[in-house]
Amino acid sequence: MAAKEVLFGNDARVKMLAGVNVLANAVKVTLGPKGRNVVLDKSFGAPLITKDGVSVAKEIELEDKFENMGAQMVKEVASKANDAAGDGTTTATVLAQAIVTEGLKAVAAGMNPMDLKRGIDKAVVAAVAELKTLSQECSDTKAIAQVGTISANSDESIGEIIATAMEKVGKEGVITVEEGQALENELDVVEGMQFDRGYLSPYFINKPETGSVELENPYILLVDKKISNIRELLPILEGLAKTGKPLMIIAEDVEGEALATLVVNNMRGIVKVAAVKAPGFGDRRKAMLQDIAILTGGTVIAEEIGLELEKATLEDLGTAKRVVITKDDTTIIDGTGEQEQISARVAQIKIQAEESTSDYDREKLQERMAKLAGGVAVIKVGAATEVEMKEKKARVEDALHATRAAVEEGVVAGGGVALIRVASKIGELDVANEDQKHGVTIALRAMEAPLRQIATNAGEEASVVANNVKNGSGNYGYNAGSDVYGDMLEMGILDPTKVTRSALQFASSIAGLMITTEAMVGDVPQEAGAGDMGGMGGGMGGMGGMGMM
């Protein structure tokens, strides 16, 4: 086991604070509308230019192992805030730095670290409760666009495209961000349920100009097995021939004689038909077939629940207004399933997604939920260069997370104003001693830090701006973008409550742990032994001998 180096008390805290400051100082320059960029060196390709706090934090690794421990703990704050709300990473880092700096000063002055932590925790609990009372619902498109704009560093086009996407696919809908081919941002909306399975035979195509199959008001047969014997399908086909309506088959596979007969029937015009493979694999395929059944008002024909294909009737089939099948995917538009059942299925999938421990499973469940709830929107980010593309895509993703958080828990006045108002409303808290009281003061003072940093980044005197805002009331604050004071909500400067809450909670949690740290243990760096180097030399000599042959 390698030898360890141990630091105690003030020596440990000084090193830890130095690491915290290096990371926080690099991150906090990005805060606010006039925040600066940070350039990150990459081992290959062009350097990355970003204003995303968590991206900067993740890059920082310090040479001194004890300073690095401090930096890594603050990095955890940024990562946690990013995971919980998808934004607010810089705010969380600024708050953590403020609490740690003041907390360690108090510890050095002889105060009890545990009591300081208890005081900080009490202040944060009171602040979170106060934030909830200040929070306002964010439901209209204009407010959603404003939240997206602020999070995307005042880029109105990003805020508007996200608001449009949410309007089209609903608040629960899936919105994905991709790299586009154009210079401008584009929005593609896929209405209805789409899955990545195309037609099983090109002979089903009835729209040669687009190379697709389009069926109007079709019946939809859902089968959880392979179909190879046409006799199993005859009762359904005979019933359909009388109605004159088209048929779409979704099965594990359709092959051999069954597929050949369907193609012949289709080409002769006896029955208009198309077949596709069911989406997914294993249990996910069964679940997705059930989703389609609920969406279209049909039944999945599966032998494991006692249903046989030969005995299926038209009543077992689902229906939809329209189906479009291309070489690669299938879209079912306006399924005729009961809205009550669809809503119940969405709620069931939502619970599964919340309980899932796998990110991949959660993503797939959210995708299924969106397909049932109304559709999928794809934002294609446009830019002139690859460097700009990466930076812009990160901003769009941040803005998307922020708008989702705003819809979930509402919004508060932005620009650091909400935390100032919260701090002013917290009166005398019930504390056990003076040290806990000082802990409360540390937390309340730290809540000014985001506003002060926004003002500093805008080139203003932080103390003057903070006093002006504190002397105001309600949503009165400082708009650093246009350098004016006024009502933040009217000026469209909003922060999602969830983002502000998460930043405060995670910052105080990690900062509390750092304040109560009394010792740090790290590996003693090992010097390379001379014997090892000699061994390498011998090997090289052997290679030289080989070269002489």
From Swiss-Prot:
InterPro entries, alphabetized: Chaperonin_Cpn60_CS, Cpn60/GroEL, Cpn60/GroEL/TCP-1, GroEL-like_apical_dom_sf, GROEL-like_equatorial_sf, TCP-1-like_intermed_sf
Catalytic activity entry: ATP + H2O + a folded polypeptide = ADP + phosphate + an unfolded polypeptide
GO MF entries: ATP binding; ATP-dependent protein folding chaperone; isomerase activity; unfolded protein binding
Keyword Phosphoprotein: no
Subcellular location: Cytoplasm
Biological process (GO), any one: protein refolding
A cellular component annotation (GO) from this entry: cytoplasm
Keywords noted in UniProt: ATP-binding, Chaperone, Cytoplasm, Isomerase, Nucleotide-binding
UniProt-annotated binding residues for ATP: T30, L31, G32, P33, K51, D87, G88, T89, T90, T91, G415, D495
EC number(s) on file: 5.6.1.7
Function: Together with its co-chaperonin GroES, plays an essential role in assisting protein folding. The GroEL-GroES system forms a nano-cage that allows encapsulation of the non-native substrate proteins and provides a physical environment optimized to promote and accelerate protein folding.
Family: Belongs to the chaperonin (HSP60) family.
Subunit structure as annotated in this protein's UniProt entry: Forms a cylinder of 14 subunits composed of two heptameric rings stacked back-to-back. Interacts with the co-chaperonin GroES.
Record's protein name: Chaperonin GroEL
